Amino acid sequence: MDTTTILPILKKKLAFLSGGKDRRSGLILTIPLCSDQTSMDELSVTLDYLLSIPSEKCKARGFTVIVDGRKSQWNVVKTVVLMLQNVVPAEVSLVCVVKPDEFWDKKVTHFCFWKEKDRLGFEVILVSGNKLTRYIEPSQLTEQFGGSLTYDHMDWLNKRLVFEKFTKESTSLLDELAVINNGSDKGSQDEKERSVDFNYLPSVDPETVLQTGHELLSELQQRRFNGSDGGVSWSPMDDELLAQPQVMKLLDSLREQYTRYQEVCRQRSKRTQLDEIQQKVMQVVGWLEGPGSEQLRTQWGIGDSFRASQAFQQKHEEIESQHSEWFAVYVELNQQIAALLNAGDEEDLVELKTLQQRLSDVCYRQASQLEFRQNLLQIALEFHSVAQDLSQQLDGLLGMLCVDVAPSDGSAIQQTLKLLEEKLKSVDTGLQGLRDKGQGLLDQITNQATWAYGKDVSTENKDNVDHIQGVMEDMQLRKQRCEDMVDVRRLKMLQMVQLFKCEEDAAQAVDWLNELLDALLKTHIRLGDDSQETKILLEKHRKFVDVAQSTYDYGRQLLQATVVLCQSLRCTSRSSGDTLPKLNRVWKQFTITSEERVHRLEMALAFHSNAEKILQECPDLGEAVMEFEQFDEVEAVGKSLLDRLTVPVIYPDGTEQYFGTPSDMAFTAEHIRERIKMVCLKKQQLLEPDESIRES
């Protein structure tokens, strides 16, 4: 029964052989009744097909049939059980009817199966799905019955289709190959000498059929042992179901017949090749020694430009294209001759070797001439290509040198200078490459006379040599002129770079002075808590002023340098009218601010020194009267210092700036007031004893 004819029925999975076995090694046939609309005719066809698969030996061990009635009515189950006696062989040993949870009337079902017991010929038991393992091992039951056996119906069906297709194709192919091979053995000598035509070709490709068979066999063997990795073993397509030995037997027969068929074809093909080879050899030799050689005799030039070399190369490619067709014939003939020589026919060996030797000599000589000419033209093309590129580079470099450089900024000048150096370096590299290519081309031209076939090519060679040397000399002169112009331009551009660097650094000096001025106003605000600290602050301020002075001097020197460079470059400096006033203005502001800072520090030093002297000394009553004037002087200096803190720094342009923030000034003033209070308190202490003496 052909699977393809009943494929729609088989896809319904009305019954299947899962590959599981009962405890007597009998196959398990499962009938899943999924609905009440199960067609008994289709079920009968499915059972007939499934029971035709196992071998007779397997059938002799009997079947266990599982009828899954959990989703069906009792009447359908009964009909299926009664139908089994007509479809299933007599070796059926047990029919397990899986009953639903809400079972049919026990008396009715028991009576019905007991009534038909003698006529059925096999035992029928009713069992729940979860108790089916009492009769069959769990490893032999599918998952729907609580087992661990894996079964994929569509996969099984697809493999079955492949198996039947292979069996059909291989059987037909064996018959065809047998006819071809036997006919060759019995045919006459004239028939053996005929070439292989369509009458000797099988209807299908033997290689394809063999490949299909090997893939099928590999799949069957893999599935048979697929439990070796620790998974659940499932082999529903083993030798009992798909006749694995049958596949192996068919493959062995196919290999044997196909090997014979290949030998028959080889012998016939070898016998028909000899005459064709002899004819083709003479055709190849005749063309290569005639028209082919004449084409090469007329081609000797290399061209005087890139386009001219391209034209020569294109013409040579046309000649090579014509030769390649004959060389392809030579390769084919050489392979055919080698194959016939390997066959070992003594009567053909001498003639074949002679033909092979003559053909090889002519082809290799012509191929060497073509290769030499191709190499010569390739080197000439590369030489002219390098010369053309170098000429364009020199033109570009010359154009760049002829355009005057307008200064914009130092970065742009640096970039232009870098580009100029790169172009000059590229020209040097190109010229060296031109020399190398030219020397290689000269060496190749010197060897050209060896392929002249007796033709005098000295005139052509002399013209080519003069042209090559002339190109190299011209490029050398052009490169030297550009180098001289580059030296002049480099000097000018370096001066421009130096000019913009000086202007940039001068502007930076202005920024630095602004930063120093800003730091002086915002951070240099402390006057010291005592004379020692004030002295330290005064010394630090002097060093700070030295830094600012050196920055200003540096900026002035840079601006003077820009004037000299501008005179050399004959251009107007942007800094002389812009940066210099800025530099002088910020320096003037810094100087005024610094002087104010020094004045405040000196006042603070005088105040702290006198206050400390008064507070530390302990004069007697006679001297105290003499020092009251010192108390008044210290108090006056302190108040003057407090007044000074509230006065802003006034610049020539009328702008005003304060040291620090109001909170900073308040903090400094508070400390000075504390000192003044201490001095006043000391003065009061000295006055009190004096008054007590007077009263006494």
Curated annotation (Swiss-Prot):
Instruction: Give the matching SUPFAM superfamilies.
Output: Spectrin repeat
Give the Spectrin repeat ranges. 272-378, 381-494, 500-602
Sorted alphabetically, which keywords does the UniProt record give? Repeat
Q: What's its job?
A: May act as the primary docking protein directing membrane turnover and assembly of the transient receptor potential channels trpc4 and trpc5. Binds phospholipids.
A GO MF annotation of the entry reads: phosphatidylinositol-3,5-bisphosphate binding
Q: Does the keyword Ribosomal protein apply?
A: no
Q: What is the protein name stated in its UniProt record?
A: SEC14 domain and spectrin repeat-containing protein 1-A
Asked if Repeat is a keyword of the record, the answer is yes
- The family this protein is said to belong to: Belongs to the SOLO family.
- UniProt lineage: Eukaryota, Metazoa, Chordata, Craniata, Vertebrata
Cite the CRAL-TRIO domain residue spans from the record: 1-153
Q: Which Pfam families match?
A: CRAL_TRIO_2 (PF13716), Spectrin_SESTD1 (PF24915)
Source taxon at top rank: Eukaryota
